[in-house]
């Protein structure tokens, strides 16, 4: 989570890459406090930044982040835009609280720091193709194309208009491996 921990993991992964380049695909979970140097290292090494936008629930004024990190460090958390613009691969997930991926997309597109907000498309891509890549499943999951699993949801409304309301959209249908497993239509 913290900047020192991220640096320590980057050091270890970079050592591993020197010993056996290309042998592994690494990721770091909870990349919440990456500084500029760490973001640059993530981009250069191809290490995936696995982050949980729903953690921004704690980012509000007088929230958990501010109570534990202080205002200055809180302002440096969850730098999604900086990471994406630097070429870092993003993988989004929930980490168990709250689990709803639409809430996480909402958090990524309405982040308290306007400079770190992603577009709906970028956030959805991090939850789908980015997560599949991080889990070594990009050949089966994360996109809808011939030869991949047909796992997807149909939403009641467009998540793009308005993006700020995405967490209020209901799921109309869920399809897993091409079979409808939930249908609220």
Ranges and model annotations:
Residues 165-174:
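Short, compositionally biased
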